[in-house]
Regions:
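Amphipathic heptad-repeat coiled-coil/leucine-zipper-like oligomerization helices
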Residues: 1-77
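Extended, beta-strand-rich, solvent-exposed assembly scaffolds of outer structural proteins
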Residues: 47-203, 209-212
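Short acidic, Pro/Gly- and aromatic-enriched capping/linker segments at domain boundaries
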Residues: 207-228
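Extracellular structured ligand-interaction cores
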Residues: 104-106, 221-223, 233
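Amphipathic alpha-helical polymerization modules
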Residues: 1-17, 144, 158, 257-369
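Polar, low-complexity tracts enriched in small residues
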Residues: 119-149, 153, 160, 226-306
Length: 369
């Protein structure tokens, strides 16, 4: 199991079935997505937002939980309107119509979705009594116009909550499930996820822990090493929970775990939104580990192995040549050389012996009397 770090005999991940469907009391990704979608949609089906009107003032409210849409901005081009927010806790946006807007005036609301993506709802004032999509009618009074604006904003939010929001919820549920530890929704009263207000850490008792390999503080590459030459060691370990690999598994799992009922008229729009998000995730943000980074690390190790193999081959060839020179000596020729050397040595030793017997007295003449 090469993606298990140092635990080569241990599977790197839980089974596909367990990850997607769960097992026993352990929730799989499908359940985590379903619970997150309920929590983000909310009890009213408006993604945890609400719109109210008082006289000629329209107020857009966020419920203050970590679920659903988050109000992040508003841009107004409505004539005579005083627009403030988002401000307060929980955030609200207030639109006070001091006079009726002009035909064609617009107002835009910026929303952040659970997965961190953003959406803009743009509404345009129209003098027509039958406004089109993304429009609201200018009434006879500011109060009537405010009611029309409320209705148009409510419709736009509801449509977004039924189409794009479920896709964002699925993506964020994937982030929750594949985090360490996993994050799960705490249901509201009566086990109602639509009224949930918080997340908590999942455990092995209630959530499938998808990564089952070794997970120490040691860098992944250093979990497996090999000596390929004297003073040369390569690192080639890998873990399935590395950022790039996790991202790939997560996106694939989210697509596999997301299903749509035939009776859901918004299924196609939701699927398209999810597909766009998954496609965008194929290009991670700058500075984030990619599959190419891991490939580069392994390729560098492979290059080191290749170079070491060449060096080892050259060394083996040299040693083989030396061994062949030793093993390939002509024994007859060596014998003749040894005999010649022995004869020379014997002659030398004979001369040396004779020289050792010489004495000065042998060369002195007798002294006459």
């Amino acid at each position: 199991y090469i993606f298990s770090g140092s635990a080569l005999n241990q599977p790197a991940v839980a089974s596909t079935s367990d990850i997607i469907n769960g097992t026993g009391a352990q929730a799989g990704l499908t359940q985590i997505i379903n619970e997150r979608q309920q929590a983000d949609l909310g009890a009213t089906g408006m993604g945890r937002l609400s719109v109210s009107t008082s006289g000629s003032t329209v107020t857009l409210n966020q419920d203050g939980t970590p679920f659903g849409f988050q109000l992040t901005g508003v841009t107004s081009g409505l004539n005579g309107a005083t627009v403030t927010g988002p401000s307060g806790s929980p955030p609200t946006i207030s639109m006070a119509l001091g006079s009726n807007p002009n035909d064609g005036d617009t107002i835009s609301f910026q929303l952040t979705l659970p997965d961190g993506s953003t959406q803009t709802i743009a509404l345009q004032a129209t003098s027509s009594a039958t406004p089109g999509n993304g429009q609201f009618s200018i009434g006879a009074t500011q109060s009537a116009t405010a009611t029309n604006l409320q209705n148009a904003l409510t419709s736009a939010i509801t449509n977004l909550a039924q189409t794009t929001l479920p896709a964002a919820s699925a993506m964020e549920a994937g982030n929750n499930f594949f985090s360490d530890p996993p994050q799960i929704v705490v249901p509201g009263a009566g086990n109602n996820y639509a009224t949930a207000t918080s997340l908590t850490n999942g455990t092995a008792a209630n959530t499938v822990i998808w990564y089952t390999g070794e997970d120490s503080a040691t860098p992944a590459r250093q979990t497996q090493s090999a000596v390929v030459a004297p003073s040369t060691t390569i690192d080639y370990g890998m873990r399935a929970n590395e950022t790039a690999i996790t991202n790939l598994i997560k996106n694939t799992a989210v697509l596999a775990a997301t299903s749509y009922l035939p009776t859901n008229s918004n299924a196609q729009a939701t699927y398209q939104a999810l597909s766009q998000k998954l496609e965008g995730n194929l290009s991670p943000p700058s500075g984030t580990q990619t599959i190419a980074d891991i490939e580069s690390d392994i390729a560098n190790a492979q290059t080191t192995v290749t170079n070491a193999t060449k060096l080892n081959t050259q060394t083996q060839t040299t040693l083989s040549d030396i061994l062949n020179n030793v093993d390939g000596v002509n024994q007859t020729q060596v014998g003749e050389q040894i005999l010649t050397l022995q004869n020379s040595l014997s002659a030398s030793m004979s001369v040396t012996a004779r020289l050792a017997q010489l004495s000065l007295v042998n060369y002195l003449a007798p002294v006459s009397g």
